[in-house]
Amino acid sequence: MSIEVFNESGYDGVNEEMLIDVLSFALGEMDIHPDAEASIHIVDSDTIAELHVKWLDLEGPTDVMSFPMDELTPGYSRPDGGAPGPAMLGDIVLCPEFAEKQATKAGHDLSHELALLTVHGCLHLLGYDHVEPAQEREMFALQNELLADWYDDVDRRGVVYQPKPTGPGAFPTAADRLELDQTMIAEEQGEPGESGASAR
């Protein structure tokens, strides 16, 4: 895979090598052509808030956004999958400032949160979504499976990034993330007991 990272956030603590590793692994597991290209943009809260409004008409910053370029179906290495050739998959945009707040609430570190969000963004590039409940369950289950398998792969290779977290928020269901989103929105609005709605 050809993956470029552009860190425009000025944020310390972002392991770019780890982000490339987890994205490469996820794409490989999804049978995407090994010469496919993608990019990861790491931005500040103001930048992702602008993108959030421009593309989704939603106010405020968010954790991850994806901008697919080529429509393709996973299955490059399947006998019946054909060989579509290399593709420019698109861009994943991450906001570590926002992600760190989520990580703290979920009980793990920023690096794990960014790995999780990178896999989430990767699946969006490949056409997965979570608009309908069935889609949501499928996407989050696959996200957690890929992330857990990546940790196992890293361990087999003897590579050290962050330790694999074991807390309940480390491999969240869609309901877990919705609850986290609602908690953060309520706190930002100064209403810790109330909940709102958020879309990624």
Swiss-Prot record:
Biological role: Single strand-specific metallo-endoribonuclease involved in late-stage 70S ribosome quality control and in maturation of the 3' terminus of the 16S rRNA.
Biological process terms in GO annotation: rRNA processing
Protein name: Endoribonuclease YbeY
GO MF annotation terms: metalloendopeptidase activity; RNA endonuclease activity; zinc ion binding
GO cellular component, one term: cytoplasm
Keyword Flavoprotein: no
EC number in record: 3.1.-.-
InterPro entries associated with the record: MetalPrtase_cat_dom_sf_prd, YbeY, YbeY_CS
Binding positions for Zn(2+) per the UniProt entry: 120, 124, 130
Stored Pfam families: YbeY
Subcellular location: Cytoplasm
Cofactor(s) listed in the protein's UniProt record: Zn(2+)
The family this protein is said to belong to: Belongs to the endoribonuclease YbeY family.
Keywords: Cytoplasm, Endonuclease, Hydrolase, Metal-binding, Nuclease, Ribosome biogenesis, rRNA processing, Zinc
Major localisation: cytoplasm
Cofactor binding mode and count: Binds 1 zinc ion.
